[in-house]
C-alpha cells in the first residue's frame, strides 16, 4: 500500500488546509511530500494519527518534549492553572517562579526576560547587544538558525535550508549587510572576518551545537575562540540555546562545554511543550532592558502563566530526576545501531550525536559544518525517512533537523526502532 492509502484522512484534511493556509501548514518544516499526516493525540513516546497509526516519536515537536508527550505532572499542573484563567496581562507567580528557576539553573544568568518564542529571544538579545556595545554588525555562522527575523535569516538552517531559500525575499539588503556569516567550526575564517570588521561588530551569535542542520558538534577549540575574541574586544557572545538549553545538561551547553556566554537564548524545553522563549544574562546587560533600561522589548503574552507553569514543572522534574545519563545512553544505543547498520551493508554515511540528540547523513564520511550537510545525500535520507515511517517510527522529515530522545522512550521503543533501522536500511540497498 502507498502513503496515500495509509493516510487517507490526513489527505482530506491537508486539501482543506491548502485552501486556507500557505502550503497547507503553519510552519514550513512540517510540510513533506506528498503531504503531512495529522496527529489526533499523543502520550509518552507515541503519536496517534487521525488515520489510526501509532508512531514512536523521535521528533518530539522538534525538541521541546524531553519528558515525552503529556507528562502527567505537567498535565496536572497545566489543567489546574487553566481553571484559574489563561492570561491576565499582569505579573503572576508562575512567571516569577520560572524566572527564579532559570536564574538558579542556567550559568551566568542573573536576570531573564520571558518572551513567547525563540525568535523573539534571539531578536531581543541581538538588539540588547547592539545597544550595549554601540555597534551594529553581528557575526553568525552558516546553518545556524536563530529564528525567522530579518537580522539572522541569512544562510540559516532548519526549514530555510530545506526550502533552498535561506535568504528570504523581503529582507532589505541594508539589514543583511549588518550580518556577517562565517562557516561553522572554521576558526580561521572567523578570525579573518572579525579582523576585517572589528570596529563594527557588536555581537557574535551561535548555536553551540548546530542543531538546525541536523546535529553538528563544535570542534574542541571553536567555542573557546569565540569566547576569547569577545573577552578581548568587549563584544557580547550570544549562545542560542533554544535547542540545547536543558537538553545537554540542566545548565545547557554553557555547563556542558564549560564556556559562559554573555547572553543566552532559551525556548523549546523551557515551555514544557507550550509556547515560550527567554533571553538572559548578567545584570550588567539585562539592566538595560525596559522598563529598567531603554532597550525596548514587550509582548502581550510575555510570561504567560500557563506556559510558565508547564515550563516550571518540566524543569523541576529534570532537576529531581537528572535523566541526562539515561537519555544519552538511549541515544548512543540508537546511534550505534544505525552506524553498525550502515557499516554492515556498505552504505556510506555518518551519524553525529551530542548527548540525547543525533542525526544520520548519507553519502558522506564526515559532517562538521553546513557545507558538509548540504553535500549529504538528501534523497537517500528521504527514502530512509519514508521507510521508518512505514515501520512506525517518526523522525523529522528534514535532514536539517535533529532526532531527540525523551525519558518516555522505553526499552520496547528502542528495540522496535532498531528493528525498523534494519528493515529500512535493507530496503535502501534492495
Curated annotation (Swiss-Prot):
| Subcellular compartments | Cytoplasm
Gene encoding the protein:
hemL
Q: Which cofactor does it need?
A: pyridoxal 5'-phosphate
Quote the protein name from its UniProt record.
Glutamate-1-semialdehyde 2,1-aminomutase
The keyword Cell division belongs to this UniProt entry's keyword annotation: no
User: Could you say which residues form the signal peptide?
Assistant: none
- For the modification N6-(pyridoxal phosphate)lysine, the affected residues are 268
Q: In which pathway does it act?
A: Porphyrin-containing compound metabolism; protoporphyrin-IX biosynthesis; 5-aminolevulinate from L-glutamyl-tRNA(Glu): step 2/2
> According to the UniProt record, what class of enzyme is this?
isomerase
The molecular function terms in GO held by this entry are: glutamate-1-semialdehyde 2,1-aminomutase activity; pyridoxal phosphate binding; transaminase activity
EC numbers? 5.4.3.8
Q: Could you tell me which Pfam families the record lists for this protein?
A: Aminotran_3
- Source domain of life is Archaea
Q: Which reaction does it catalyse?
A: (S)-4-amino-5-oxopentanoate = 5-aminolevulinate
UniProtKB keywords: Cytoplasm, Isomerase, Porphyrin biosynthesis, Pyridoxal phosphate
Gene Ontology biological-process entries: protoporphyrinogen IX biosynthetic process
- What broad taxonomic lineage does this protein's source fall under? Archaea, Methanobacteriati, Methanobacteriota, Methanomada group, Methanopyri
Task: Tell me the protein family, please.
Answer: Belongs to the class-III pyridoxal-phosphate-dependent aminotransferase family. HemL subfamily.
Q: Does the keyword Flavoprotein apply?
A: no
InterPro entries given in the database record: 4pyrrol_synth_GluAld_NH2Trfase, Aminotrans_3, Aminotrans_3_PPA_site, PyrdxlP-dep_Trfase, PyrdxlP-dep_Trfase_major, PyrdxlP-dep_Trfase_small
- Entry GO CC: cytoplasm
